[in-house]
Amino acid sequence: MEQFDPGKLSLDYLLENKVITVLSWEYVIEHGKSYSRDEVEQVTRGGRDYMCYPDDMGYPDDLSDYSGLFSGVLYEGWGVLNIVYYRHYKDGLKNGVEVEFYSSGKIKNYCVWNKSRLVGKLYEWYENGMIKKLVDYNRNQRIEFNEQGKITKQGKA
């Protein structure tokens, strides 16, 4: 297995070196849709979850009754001041970056979706910004760390 420097997996390092990019809360709130406030609904068809706009007739149980598949940024908040997560969608499917936050506002995890499948690397951090978990979906590899950066578990994704 490949050796990892936990310092190079810290949130600060990845942000400073532009390995990952995180949208500001202001941008997400201004340009995104709130899952709890906007007319967007999750529908499962054929084993896939789609985010859709329901038509004016209410909330039907068939995709044909939806006025369109959602594309854009969707977010959910902790009250009015914090965001729980934001996620990109294209044609109703998870597609692009997803970022989840602790209730303190610090980043909890970061991952990338392609047509509702996780791709690349999923990073999860402790609230102090140290790496907690790294899952590399391209290499089918999973590594977990303690708060001091020591590997505690590794195996397949």
Question: What would you call each of these model-derived segments?
Answer:
Residues 1-157:
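Glycine/tyrosine- and acidic-biased, solvent-exposed loop/turn segments at the edges of beta-strands
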